[in-house]
Swiss-Prot record:
DNA-binding region per Swiss-Prot/TrEMBL record: 33-52
This protein's GO CC annotations: bacterial nucleoid; cytoplasm
GO molecular function: DNA-binding transcription factor activity; transcription cis-regulatory region binding
Record bears the keyword Cell membrane: no
Primary location: cytoplasm
Residue span, HTH tetR-type domain: 9-70
Protein name per the record: Nucleoid occlusion factor SlmA
Quaternary structure, from the entry: Homodimer. Interacts with FtsZ.
GO BP, sorted A to Z: cell division; negative regulation of division septum assembly; regulation of DNA-templated transcription
Family: Belongs to the nucleoid occlusion factor SlmA family.
Coiled-coil residue spans: 119-144
Entry function: Required for nucleoid occlusion (NO) phenomenon, which prevents Z-ring formation and cell division over the nucleoid. Acts as a DNA-associated cell division inhibitor that binds simultaneously chromosomal DNA and FtsZ, and disrupts the assembly of FtsZ polymers. SlmA-DNA-binding sequences (SBS) are dispersed on non-Ter regions of the chromosome, preventing FtsZ polymerization at these regions.
């Protein structure tokens, strides 16, 4: 029984990896059908539906992976790092680095892969970025508590600016067919970002 469950889990993972790889390839710039996905995995469409009731559930699983990966690591950054600018830098690098290592998933993060899918999926991605923005805003607000001095500008405005930088780099990565890496020249960009915050 356990062996059958492992086989099923492995097949599910294989399907999700195939979908992510298709999103990374030139197929990702078009709608991915279950027929194309099944052919890529080497199974029938019926076999796909034994593991996932719909393509939407496949995207749900990938979004869940993105959420878990980013939010759990953001929580670790907040636990381990206390200095405001280091926290912000590490959170931005986390999001950009995750996207760089997972180009297919970046198409989901930018909404590009979800254009032909259910609106609910885009809503989940919107929520993810709202949660990241909320974490950035919280880090910015805590500076006043930690250092006794906050920022000149409103923390909500600054958090939006930081997130817009991230989203812009992800969009550029997808638009360039993954040629311009999100972390490219980050060390040169970081002082410019810090200057905007102060």
């Amino acid at each position: 029984m356990a062996e059958k469950e492992n086989t099923k889990r492995n097949r599910r993972e294989e399907i999700l990896q195939a979908l992510a790889q298709m999103l990374e390839s030139s197929d990702g710039s078009q709608r991915i059908t279950t027929a194309k996905l099944a052919a890529n995995v080497g199974v029938s469409e019926a076999a796909l539906y034994r593991h996932f009731p719909s393509k939407t559930r496949m995207f749900d699983s990938l979004i869940e992976f993105i959420e878990d990966s980013l939010m759990s690591r953001i929580n670790l950054i907040l636990q381990d790092e206390k200095e405001t600018f280091n926290r912000l830098r590490l959170i931005l690098l986390l999001v950009l680095g995750f996207a760089e290592r997972n180009p297919g998933l970046t198409r989901i993060m930018t909404g590009h892969a979800l254009m032909f899918e259910q609106d609910r999926l885009q809503g989940r991605i919107n929520q993810l970025f709202e949660r990241i923005e909320m974490q950035l805003r919280q880090v910015l607000r805590e500076k006043k508590l930690r250092d006794g001095q906050g920022f000149i500008h409103d923390e909500a405005l600054l958090a939006t600016q930081l997130l817009a930088f991230c989203e812009g780099m992800l969009s550029r990565f997808v638009r360039s067919e993954f040629r311009y890496c999100p972390t490219q020249e980050f060390d040169s960009r970081w002082p410019l970002i810090v200057a905007q915050l102060q």
